[in-house]
Amino acid sequence: MKLTVSMITMNEEKAVAKVIQDIRRVAPDAEVLLVDSSKDRTAEIAQELGARVIKQFPPQGYGPAMDRAVREASGDVVITLDCDDTYPVEVIPEMVRLVEQEGFDLVNTTRTWRRPQAMPFANFLANRLFALGARVLHGLKTTDVHSGMRAYRKTMIDKVQWVAKGPALPVDMYVVPHRMGFRIKEIPIDYRERIGETTLHRWSSTVWTFKRLWNARKVK
């Protein structure tokens, strides 16, 4: 199976080279795809390292960027990854194996199977609360609905429609396939300190998350 590692970026010039080099180390033949809305040298650095870059400027937000990043991937398996060095690329081969050999359509990594030292306690509690909402409303046994690292079977992506707006798209990208009956696996990872500054607006993300968890009940 061909592999694409898709990332959305905004001013990640401090981390992008390391992240791409780490990806090449564990998946040398993978397509690395960035949907980029940066004002710094993120896109230039990525292209120098052989990545395919789609410019999205002015920025349209997390949801539309991530939707484009997975839908324009050329691989049979699409790995999503935050470009800030917080996720362990070493698990990519295992994620691909779970899709290719074990038949899963989506592999979610969970940062919050225990409290990570790199995550503020308030964020940890919020993520566990979101996960509880997914369990109660959708019967989804998870500890992390907002993980930035997942593996998707591309044929599944092509069959699923989600609301591609707002910062809570990861919720739809997890809950909707579950409600449609696709095979899902969750594996624990160790979450690390990020390189650079976060662009996440926590209050907006919280509101969107609960809104999407509630509205996704309509999916069958």
Residue ranges and their predicted role:
Residues 82-87:
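The conserved acidic donor/metal-binding loop of glycosyltransferases
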Residues 12-15, 38, 88:
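Donor nucleotide-sugar binding loop of glycosyltransferases
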Residues 2-4, 31:
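Cell-envelope/extracellular polymer assembly enzymes that use nucleotide-activated donors
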Residues 141, 165, 175-192:
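Catalytic donor-sugar/metal-binding loop of nucleotide-sugar-dependent glycosyltransferases
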Residues 11-25:
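Short, well-formed alpha-helical segments that are part of the catalytic scaffolds
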Residues 57-72, 89-167, 193-214, 218:
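Acceptor/aglycone-binding surface of glycosyltransferases and processive sugar-polymer synthases
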Residues 78:
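Short aromatic/hydrophobic "clamp" motif used to bind/position activated sugar donors
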Residues 36-43:
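A conserved acidic beta->alpha catalytic loop
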